[in-house]
Amino acid sequence: MQVILLERVAKLGQMGEVVKVKDGFARNFLLPQGKALRASDANIQAFEARKAELASRNDETRAEAEKIAEKLDGQTFVIIRSASDAGALYGSVTPRDAADVAIAEGFAVERRQVVLTAPIKELGLHEVRVHLHPEVDVTIKLNVARSAEEAELQASGKSIQELAAEEEAAAEFEIAELFDDIGSAGRDEDEAAN
């Protein structure tokens, strides 16, 4: 089906372009969302008449998105989740979680605007793209931790898994020293008895 794009659509084209798309994509997504019109002669003439209005509306929404982008770009948000000792999350962090934490901090972000390239299933710092407008994307960081203290450690550049490994090695060293002390005390008692 031939359609006229009423706004920029990713991987499809710019506003005003006549493109050929599959019928289902046009009927189920582009037409109901108001992103396109069927490319008939009447619609092409109607679009030409409304082109300036659509362009100014697009410029306004892009300007609003750029204002939000200036404040939002590079922000770090903390998400507290339960996780195993190895750092694997019980569940995963979803776009909804990212949007909710951004909204709690006072940013206007919708769930559908958050783009995760892969599911977040581990503790740590993760970069996430936020698609504010067809022409405006920003990157935010999600600091996924078990507690606020862990989040601060991760933010300072320390890995929770490395810290846990160091603590475990220190504990094993203390246990080995304790057994050495017990073993030498037992030998001293045996020598004193002889």
UniProtKB/Swiss-Prot annotation:
Pfam families: Ribosomal_L9_C, Ribosomal_L9_N
Keywords: Ribonucleoprotein, Ribosomal protein, RNA-binding, rRNA-binding
Any Gene Ontology CC annotation: ribosome
Parts forming coiled coils: none
GO biological process, any: translation
One MF annotation (Gene Ontology) recorded for this entry: rRNA binding
Family matches, as InterPro entries: Ribosomal_bL9 (IPR000244), Ribosomal_bL9/RNase_H1_N (IPR009027), Ribosomal_bL9_bac/chp (IPR020594), Ribosomal_bL9_C (IPR020069), Ribosomal_bL9_C_sf (IPR036791), Ribosomal_bL9_N (IPR020070), Ribosomal_bL9_N_sf (IPR036935)
Function comment: Binds to the 23S rRNA.
Record family assignment: Belongs to the bacterial ribosomal protein bL9 family.
PANTHER family according to UniProt: 50S RIBOSOMAL PROTEIN L9
Record's protein name: Large ribosomal subunit protein bL9
Species the sequence originates in: Paracoccus denitrificans (strain Pd 1222)
Lineage per the UniProt record: Bacteria, Pseudomonadati, Pseudomonadota, Alphaproteobacteria, Rhodobacterales
GN (gene name): rplI
